[in-house]
Amino acid sequence: MTKSIQAIRGMSDTLPEEIPYWSFLENACRSVVSAYHYREIRFPVVEQTALFKRTIGEATDIVEKEMYTFTDRNGDSLTLRPEGTAGCVRAGIQNGLLYNQIQRLWYLGPMFRHERPQKGRYRQFYQLGVETYGMAGAPIEAELIFMCLRLWKALGLESCIHLELNTLGTLDSRNAYRQALVTYLQSREKELDEDSRRRLHTNPLRILDSKNPDLQPLLAEAPKLIDYLDETSRRHFDQLRSLLDQAEVPFIVNPTLVRGLDYYTHTVFEWVTDQLGAQGTVCAGGRYDNLVELLGGKSTPAAGFAAGLERLVLLLRGVQECLDKIDIYVVIAGEAVIQEGLLMTEQLRNVLPEWVIEADLSGSSLKSQFKRADKSGAKWALVIAEEEIKTNTVTLKHLRETVPQKSLTRDTLIPYLKSEG
């Protein structure tokens, strides 16, 4: 027997019973971002490797260990996108969208990272990305956070996700803090784990994000970035916090919050849940004013966020009842009436376009069809048999309530269904 081919580890199939949650989530994303008049942009999943090395940072875990990179037939180094911001900026510069313009853009699609697969972490994963260009102040950052909160409310998730904030300040203040942090950590290098010792010489800010419990006392005594902020950075962060307070958006200032991408400045934020274990971050973002210039464009203020759809789906399954709803399951009794049943079902769809109607065209027994009807979650079973066709009637059975089934003429069926809706 030929051995079957399996999916690549960490790249999972999304099965039909899961799709309703994905559709619900994706529709909510589109609805919320459109309400703020953000416009969709689409760009390739494959980019030149140099794009990510320049923007994400060569010393980051993503570039060092996680990217899917290959050489094509022309000898060019290409990479499956590990995140969307760099590609969005590249597309904006190349197509003239960013020069002296204000832009509000969004995208939704797959990203790829060679990480260790676990619950909520995959090698192919989907993100909603939202990016803004041309607006330098804290108000646009507040708008992004308001948008996130509106999305959580639309999904019914606002009670299980909380907001954490920090500021990295300007590049100058960040560099001053970096030096102070390195000096402190070097004085206690023997207490660091192997991963942190490596990061000490490549990306020391990432040590603050360590989940190793043995390092937490050491990190608690580390210099605080807020003590190295210049006055402009302080005012910026104070204004953002004031806006969130006025809008009654609860938040926690987390001084150890840093992002794993080198291009962030000023504000960074994460939306976090305690219901997914180690993979608690469901959305993250911040400001990255230097990124457009880094990629060859004119200096342009920019801010945005990305939300992980797989993690949001995991949360959705815990709070939303089954989203795969059927209104009517049409039971067709006997092969002789399948054609008539099919045509009648199509007529029902014509007059009830918002209803979900499934016709059983299997020709199997009534018992089997009623089992499938009940399992489908449908509210009604509509029975079409030879006797009903002769008398121009149908039998309507309520599957979710214990009430007598009804025999209705075809003329009275539609008004009755609409009244019972």
From Swiss-Prot:
Question: Which GO biological process categories is it annotated with?
Answer: histidyl-tRNA aminoacylation
Record localization: Cytoplasm
Q: Which domain of life is it from?
A: Bacteria
Q: How does it assemble?
A: Homodimer.
Keyword Cytoplasm on entry: yes
User: Mind listing the UniProt keywords for this protein, alphabetically?
Assistant: Aminoacyl-tRNA synthetase, ATP-binding, Cytoplasm, Ligase, Nucleotide-binding, Protein biosynthesis
Q: Which CDD domains does this one have?
A: HisRS-like_core, HisRS_anticodon
Task: Tell me what this protein is called.
Answer: Histidine--tRNA ligase
Q: What is its EC number?
A: 6.1.1.21
Output the InterPro entries linked to this UniProt entry: aa-tRNA-synth_II, aa-tRNA-synth_II/BPL/LPL, Anticodon-bd, Anticodon-bd_dom_sf, His-tRNA-ligase, HisRS-like_core, HisRS/HisZ, HisRS_anticodon
* SUPFAM superfamilies, A to Z: Class II aaRS ABD-related, Class II aaRS and biotin synthetases
Q: Which family does it belong to?
A: Belongs to the class-II aminoacyl-tRNA synthetase family.
Q: Which reaction does it catalyse?
A: tRNA(His) + L-histidine + ATP = L-histidyl-tRNA(His) + AMP + diphosphate + H(+)
UniProt cross-references to NCBIfam families, sorted A to Z: hisS
Gene encoding the protein: hisS
